Amino acid sequence: MSETAEKAIEIWKIRRLVKQLINCHGNGTSMITLIIPPGEQISRYSNMLAEEYGTASNIKSRVNRLSVLSAITSTRERLKLYNKVPDNGLVIYCGEVIMEGNKTRKLNIDFEPFKPINTSQYLCDNKFHTEALAELLESDQRFGFIVMDGHQTLYGVVSGSAREVLQRFTVDLPKKHGRGGQSALRFARLRDEKRHNYVRKVAEGAVQHFITDDKPNVAGIVLAGSADFKTELGQSDLFDQRLQSRIIKTVDVSYGGDAGFNQAIELAADTLSNVKYVQEKKLIQRFFDEISLDSGKYCFGVVDTMNALQEGAVETLLCFADLDMIRYEFKNSEGNPVITYMTKEQEEKDSTNSFLLDKDTGAEMELVSSMLLSEWLAEHYKDYGANLEFVSDRSQEGMQFVKGFGGIGAVMRYQLDLSMLDPESDEFYSDSD
């Protein structure tokens, strides 16, 4: 599996972790956030935590004091696992989290981020602080688009899986005049002046949208449009030199506005090949192509996809990043494992909890583990020799994959008759749900 794809999975894990941590709350100031940037000394932070322990011993509230001391102790224990700060820095979260029914649970997490985190932070609060992680996620490459023709201009950005229109405006330029003589010269001057002012306005808008704190805020700029407006803009002295150096592609499009923006993204695909939005469309399109060819080298829905994975037949597994599917592993009365997949909605509808019962004996099975299927896949996909790609529903193809195919499917290495396999969880899951 490529380094880029593995990094994408690490990013997905952090994104999901941030979502979970944001919803965690505690009593008092017993939730610790510790972020250590690359190049720092572990000993410095060990000494700092020792001092913090002494200070926390003076907290008047007994309950809060014990909680804070416990969190500091857990943080120190986590820190001892490292001889030095990892290359990308170190992030530690420790503390007691309030669960449903006002119960508390200790949460201790330590990890190296997927890229350097240049923040030093130590906070005791009633929540975990994830702002620094959120910044890491947001700082994926952004590409600016200017779609310009004789009727309108659109500014947009593509970053990761997202495309966003920043601004659009229309323009009313005079058409070429058919008369001759002085009248023609006058109209030509007027037309050139309005065209010049239009290019100036577009250039000024580019600075407004693509420069922040005197620096370009995009990794590259794509100029798109019909006629020669886009070329004129790129070569004009009116176009900011800082942005001129960021032009990576100029493309001809048949439309203006949103349609032109979408076409420009497609035409610039090779240049933007590292942008997740484009990669995602290509991945899902390959899946759709296999279906169109009726090649037999595809599957979709959780039951068929997981069976194909177990058989080692999956080359590339596609999974909706926010798939609401839980993987339950039970042990039946004979000690054999039973795997069941259910959405939270299906579980809520199952008022009798029939999914907990052995379908042969009716006896309640022993629960071994339960976790989101997406998280299980992120941990185990390599065991089956598969590539794993998380996709969003932000593109048209992604939306179709989620709505029409259940948000999980695969391109297979070879044809496999899935009807010959015995899907243990078929009783509890319908691909149409």
Swiss-Prot record:
GO terms for cellular component: cytosol; translation release factor complex. The modification N5-methylglutamine is found at residue 182. Disulfide bonds: none annotated. Changing residue 288 to A: Reduced interaction with sup35/eRF3. GO terms for biological process: cytoplasmic translational termination. One of its GO terms (molecular function) is GTPase regulator activity. NCBIfam families: aRF1_eRF1 (TIGR03676). Belongs to the eukaryotic release factor 1 family. This is Eukaryotic peptide chain release factor subunit 1. The gene is sup45.
